[in-house]
Amino acid sequence: MTGPRVRTVTAAALRAQPLPAPGGDKEQRGRVLIVGGSARVPGAVMLAGEAALRAGAGKLQLATAASVAPGMALAMPEALVLGLGENGQGEIVRGHRALDAAMSACDAAVIGPGMASTNTTAALVKRAIDQAVCTLVLDAGALSPRLRAPLGRPFVLTPHAGEMAALAGDDKAAVEAAPADYALAFAKKMRSVVIVKGADSFVAGPDGALWVHRGGVPGLGTSGSGDTLAGLIAGFAARGCDALTAALWGVFVHATAGKQLAKRIGTVGFLAREIPPEVPGILDRLPRG
């Protein structure tokens, strides 16, 4: 019995799944909402937000801990920033009507960067998911084995091997030995697009489609790198890509940015904040449909 066909994510393959035309209006390129962060880790939301804008999204909203929201608004003038209730540890624990309205009005959202995975944050994640009518990218603190996307509206889940192991209740070594199998199984179980990130990143769709991007550079294994990937995917989704296409473009562009930085700065040591500025030039050089 043969396994599923594995397709390779390349620039040529993406030609068959082109991005929507850039257009001249920010409304046409969509609105992205990033929900996450904490008083101790506010930067994750900013990394994802900048990546979404660099991918071409037209508008950006950030929802994070109220104590850091004013500073974030000053640091990122391109974004509308919402402050959320937090507990004594600075973790966001409560949504509100403004977040509900933002979630129901966005074209793509990222939930989870910089968030801890706790019972209290789980309630916030559930509330946000329940309000959403857009493509959702779930990362870090939003990942849960209980997730299951609505029929016809797959989530995009972006676990690394350790997070995938936690979702599966297995050890990390098992995931690293068979990442494609885990991606396929959980894509079907969660009715979602699942990216198991690594040097070779596997992307599986709920219909059994399986893709691999090979040759990621070691320097991408750095703090905040996954936040930029999640933001890129949301940016492409906001522009009009379906969940799988947005994931494939995100993985390829993220890896290409890493290769450029490795060549210019060094194999390791470049920073996650340096990834988003690479993106517009990469998009201009990639083949168009």
Curated annotation (Swiss-Prot):
GO terms for biological process: metabolite repair; nicotinamide nucleotide metabolic process. InterPro entries: CARKD, Ribokinase-like. It holds the Pfam family Carb_kinase. The keyword Secreted does not apply. The keyword tRNA processing does not apply. (6S)-NADPHX binds at residues 44, 160, 227. It is an enzyme of class 4 (lyase). Its cofactor is Mg(2+). This is ADP-dependent (S)-NAD(P)H-hydrate dehydratase.
